[in-house]
Structures are given as structure tokens and as C-alpha cells.
Amino acid sequence: MERILYQVFPSDTNYSYDPPAVTAPSQGSSQTDFGKVVIALVVILVSVGVFYLAYTLFLKDCILLFKAKKQRTTTEIGFGQTPARNQDHPGP
């Protein structure tokens, strides 16, 4: 009977493991461009919505308050420019 010797690792090979290169299926440029457009539209719509809600809930009141402090009374806001009141003859 013959004795067979097995060589487990070849002597001339590098023993480090190099995984095979896997190429991912590349998406078409039109799909990536469409995705960027969708993201841009979503960001724009959300920012416009936030600004609209901020204006209706908060900023409009702040603008009216600023105008009221600048003028004499809050009733003068809707009537535009009113003449200055004379301090010598106060009104009724």
C-alpha cells in the first residue's frame, strides 16, 4: 500500500484572504437625478410650509405689535399714516 501525503496549503500562494470583487448594479444617471429633484422639492415644500405656519401663527402678530409700538395706538395701524397730535391741544 502506498502512502499518500497531502499538502493542505500550496507553498507558493499568499495566505491572506482576498474576497472576490462584487460589482453592484449601477443605477442609471436619470434615476439618481430624479431622486435629487424629489429631495429638493420635498425640502422646498417643507420649508415653505414651515414659513407659512410661522407667519400665520407667530410672525403676523409680531409685525402688528412692532407697528403698534411704532405708532400711537393699535387702532391707527389699519388707517395708515396719521398726522402727529398737537401736545398743546389734546383731543377728546
Curated annotation (Swiss-Prot):
Substitution effect: I39V: In strain: Mild
Official protein name in the record: Movement protein
Record's subcellular location: Host membrane
Species the sequence originates in: Bean yellow dwarf virus
Chief place where the protein resides: host cell
Functional note: Involved in the viral transport within, and between cells.
Keyword Phosphoprotein recorded: no
Membrane topology: Single-pass membrane protein
Keyword check for Transcription: no
